[in-house]
């Protein structure tokens, strides 16, 4: 199991104070890494830190606005100052506004791209400078099954998540010789605050997803933990530029 041991590593998870981000932070921490949680809501940050510390995970948090380059740069630098280095970056911060294309205001549409895609560029660019100091690193970008499909009432979301996959491939191609592996995870329908609202808006969604998904159920945030540990560990040293669906088989069911 040493192949998956993250002892002595430092991981930063944006949007790490709930849902998929918190589940990944927990799994990475349980594998031995020290964890930095970043999010806009300081109360949620603090509660998440308390949870991880109760599991004997070394953890701190920072407030960040991932749509602001200076805030992202400060976050990365502060994480390094806190623990002396950075080895793993999980770009998980995300948002959505569900509307028909003609109903969006341009600023709403741009705000989704800024949060879901541009923030990954900004944080990864800064992290690269610190990864070079420790001989490499791991970047995990959180896409979506809607990286592969066009989401109804989600043109900005689908565009941003499709961009995540191509950004991941480009980073991987560029930074491979720097010993930096960059991969994407594409969650399916996971039971989070975001998807709970979707089920309110679309009452038939619950049953529809369960019927189409070979696993026969919605995912739990903890279902993402194993993939996060794999992509953070030495076990994935020869894996880069991939986009791994974690969706109970939804995406193979055409």
Residue ranges and their predicted role:
Residues 1-3, 149, 228-229, 240-254:
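Short C-terminal tail/terminal secondary-structure segment
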Residues 129, 173-177, 237:
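Alpha-helical segment proximal to the catalytic Tyr-Lys
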Residues 90, 176, 181, 239-241:
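Short, small/polar-rich loop/turn modules that mediate ligand/substrate recognition or access, typified
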Residues 100-101, 105-113, 205, 209:
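Substrate-binding pocket helix/loop in short-chain dehydrogenase/reductase
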Residues 124, 160, 168:
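Active-site helix of classical SDR
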Residues 10, 17-18, 41:
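Conserved glycine-rich cofactor-binding loop
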Residues 144:
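Residue(s) in the substrate-gating loop at a strand-loop-helix junction
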